[in-house]
From Swiss-Prot:
Widely expressed with higher levels in testis. This is Deoxynucleotidyltransferase terminal-interacting protein 2. There is a cross-link at residues 217, 220, 257, 316, 321, 345, 384, 558, 584, 606, 626, 649, 658, 686, 731 (Glycyl lysine isopeptide (Lys-Gly) (interchain with G-Cter in SUMO2)). Its main location: nucleus. Residues 201-211 have a biased composition (Basic residues). Residues 1-99, 156-261, 510-547 are annotated as: Disordered. It comes from Homo sapiens (Human). Disulfide bonds: none annotated.
Length: 756
């Protein structure tokens, strides 16, 4: 394991600066994770002496202090005993000015390897060791010293809060994962300068770097040698920018957690702005050098667009129009610049003011310097894309997301002078190397933070995720289902006749059609982007169906007046709802014809000539005599008991009926409760009916005969009646006593007669 002094110096810089300034902070997670994971170095004193000048320039929030106390623990200075004493002084100077050294950033949920040196994590995440440790740091030191000037100018400028990041996690398009391997090399090459072309917002770290650059007028980078002469304010600001880039790299990596490096240059590595250059260049595996060469070739075409894009950053009117242009140019330029900086020995001295114009001028100078050695550096710079996936392996908690990346354009001394005018700059996360294969665009609408940068930590920007993929397919599928659902079930109103006259919809079919139409209308309202041609066809179909339903409803209302509408023409069916004898059906009869037929039947009944006319002995008279009419009326009258008895008919006499009538007569003579007229006792009645007595509900409790006591016949009822039996016994004893008295009197008379 190679532990460099540069990493050690960087850790001391960040720890000291984080400890000294505990008043204001942004993106606290990366700030505390960085000093903990950095390795030791013998050049600690040099780095600390260089950082003391600008420690107070770094604002931090209480969240940063809390996070720091959690992760770093007892590492206020972040120094450890040096393990590599042979590293040159140039490396230590380089580590001070460059914030791309080996860094392991540890969050709550994941650990991100920024550098190739093995480091320890707080959460005991698996350590990732570098695959190539023998890569010469002398070459990297001066190359990254050039990049340090670039990274200080170009920082990630997007303000992302926890709410937006939580939305972006669920809204990133998974279709971008297919392009990750093709873009991995380009991603690594453009990680530190990702926002050079599309810097939509200036952060606090950007303003601090602008300060550092104004103070860095004495610092010079020697192109031939590996040593750098860098002022102390530059070192402190480099450490600050290192920490800031850590925070922003982690935030966008958390946003793109499902697809590790799909949103390459704009999401994941634009926020790592300038700290990852050593991470990429010290890796051993070169996965896709051809695409990096192609991206370097595209730099010549888009080199002229850098200055235009820098001007567009300061203009609010041209922000939305140049969105795709900014994406293309920034991607290609960053790729070429990434590969050219490790071998570029030319000095890059950037002098910037607090205003954005000086920043863009310095960017153009940097790009001009970088373009010199892009072809010589394509094959020499080893790139490993596994570092890209490491950002997606680690996760951050919700508390960390709230305090992580709050990119605020804040300047401690001059807030009003720096105004980058980035109100509603749309930030596209789709990589351009895929060239039109991305189906989704991540639109981050960020608010204006010109002078109120301190309060912008509490702001929550909205994240708009527009899905363009699969809408036509879903629309076509909906139309297909409509065509299947629109099949109508019809009923033949004239069975057996012509089956193509009238067709009616059932009530269920009508309800289902109306429900389908309502659902489809709601779906059409919800869909924001649909093809106009398909939509017009659907509307035509709906209009035709509505016309058909309206016509059928009008017919159905005219059929019947009953509450239950069967949906059939009852009159056409001859007054029958269901007729199984379709052959004998007499349909469409008019009332006039029916009246005429009735009259014919009546006349035929009175006719003398009948089918059996030949069998008669004489010709029957046409009109009957009065006597005959009286006989007929009498016969008809005798059939019923008359209107007084409601037309009660005489039943057919049977033996059972005769026995019942006899019992009734006997009871009449023996039961004092019954009284019958004398006329009713003679013979049997002619008109009578035998029925069952239905109990009144009120008689259920007081005058009801239980089921067990009910008898089958009248005789059994009489025998079961206790009162009737008592009465019968008494009468029987009286009769018997009378007979005995009569018999005794007769005997007495006879004896007396003999005596005489």
């Amino acid at each position: 394991m190679v532990v460099t002094r540069s990493a050690r110096a960087k850790a001391s810089i960040q720890a000291a600066s984080a400890e000294s300034s505990g008043q204001k902070s942004f993106a606290a997670n990366g700030i505390q994770a960085h000093p903990e994971s950095s390795t030791g170095s013998d050049a600690r004193t040099t780095a600390e002496s260089q950082t003391t000048g600008k420690q107070s320039l770094i604002p931090r929030t209480p969240k940063a202090r809390k996070r720091k106390s959690r992760t770093t623990g007892s590492l206020p200075k972040g120094t450890e005993p040096s393990t590599d004493g042979e590293t040159s002084e140039a490396e230590s100077n380089y580590s001070v000015s460059e914030h791309h050294d080996t860094i392991l950033r540890v969050t709550r949920r994941r650990q991100i390897l920024i550098a190739c040196s093995p480091v320890s994590s707080v959460r005991k995440k698996p350590k990732v060791t570098p695959t190539k440790e023998s890569y010469t740091e002398e070459i990297v030191s001066e190359a990254e010293s050039h990049v340090s000037g670039i990274s200080r100018i170009v920082l990630p400028t997007e303000k992302t809060t926890g709410a937006r990041r939580s939305k972006a996690k669920s809204l990133t398009d998974p279709s971008q994962e297919s392009h990750t391997e093709a873009i991995s090399d380009a991603e690594t090459s453009s990680s530190d300068i990702s926002f050079s072309g599309i810097a939509t917002r200036r952060t606090r770290s950007m303003q601090r770097k602008l300060k550092a650059q104004t103070e860095k007028k004495d610092s010079k980078i020697v192109p031939g040698n590996e040593k750098q002469i860098v002022g102390t304010p530059v070192n402190s600001e480099d450490s600050d920018t290192r920490q800031t880039s850590h925070l922003q790299a982690r935030s966008l990596s958390e946003i793109n957690k499902p697809n590790f490096y799909n949103n390459d240059f704009d999401d994941d590595f634009s926020h790592r702005s300038s700290e990852n250059i050593l991470t990429v260049h010290e890796q051993a595996n070169v996965e896709s050098l051809k695409e990096t060469k192609q991206n370097c070739k595209d730099l010549d075409e888009d080199a002229n667009g850098i200055t235009d894009e820098g001007k567009e950053i300061n203009e609010k009117s041209s922000q939305l129009k140049n969105l795709s242009e900014l994406q293309d140019t920034s991607l290609q330029q960053l790729v070429s610049q990434r590969h050219s900086t490790p071998q570029n020995k030319n000095a890059v001295s950037v002098h910037s003011n607090l205003n954005s114009e000086a920043v863009m001028k310095s960017l153009t100078q940097t790009f001009a310097t970088v373009e010199v050695g892009r072809w010589n550096n394509n094959k020499k710079s080893p790139i490993k894309a596994s570092d890209l996936t490491k950002f997606g392996d680690c996760g951050g908690s919700d508390d960390e997301e709230e305090s992580t990346v709050i990119s605020v354009s804040e300047d401690m001394n001059s807030e009003g002078n720096v105004d980058f005018e980035c109100d509603t700059k749309l930030y596209t996360s789709a990589p351009n190397t895929s060239q039109g294969k991305d189906n989704s665009v991540l639109l981050v609408l960020s608010s204006d933070e010109s002078q109120q940068s301190e309060n912008s930590e509490n702001e929550e920007d909205t994240l708009c995720f527009v899905e363009n993929s699969g809408q036509r397919e879903s629309l076509s599928g909906d139309t297909g289902s409509l065509s299947c659902d629109n099949a109508l079930f019809v009923i033949d109103t004239t069975p057996g006749m012509s089956a193509d006259k009238n067709f009616y919809l059932e009530e269920e079919d009508k309800a289902s059609e109306v429900a389908i139409e309502e659902e489809k209308e709601e779906e059409e309202d919800e869909k924001s982007e649909e093809d106009s041609s398909d939509h017009d066809e659907n509307e035509d179909e709906f209009s035709d169906e509505e016309d058909f339903l309206n016509s059928t409803k009008a017919k159905l209302l005219k059929l019947t007046s009953s509450s239950i509408d069967p949906g059939l023409s009852i009159k056409q069916l001859g007054g029958l709802y269901i007729n199984f004898n379709a052959d004998k059906l007499q349909s469409n009869k008019r009332t006039l014809t029916q009246i005429k037929e009735k009259k014919k039947n009546e006349l035929l009944q009175k006719a003398v000539i009948t089918p059996d006319f030949e069998k008669n002995h004489c010709v029957p008279p046409y009109s009957e005599s009065k006597y005959q009419l009286q006989k007929k009326r009498r016969k008809e009258r005798q059939k019923t008991a008359g209107d007084g008895w409601f037309g009660m008919k005489a039943p057919e006499m049977t033996n059972e009926l005769k026995n019942d009538l006899k019992a009734l007569k006997m009871r009449a003579s023996m039961d004092p409760k019954r009284f019958y007229k004398k006329n009713d006792r003679d013979g049997f009645p002619k008109y009578f009916q035998i029925g069952t007595i239905v109990d009144n509900p009120a008689d259920f409790y007081h005058s009801r005969i239980p089921k067990k006591q009910r008898k089958r016949t009248i005789v059994e009822e009489l025998l079961a009646d206790s009162e009737f039996r008592r009465y019968n016994r008494r009468k029987y004893s009286e009769i018997m006593a009378e007979k005995a008295a009569n018999a005794a009197g007769k005997k007495f008379r006879k004896k007396k007669k003999f005596r005489n």
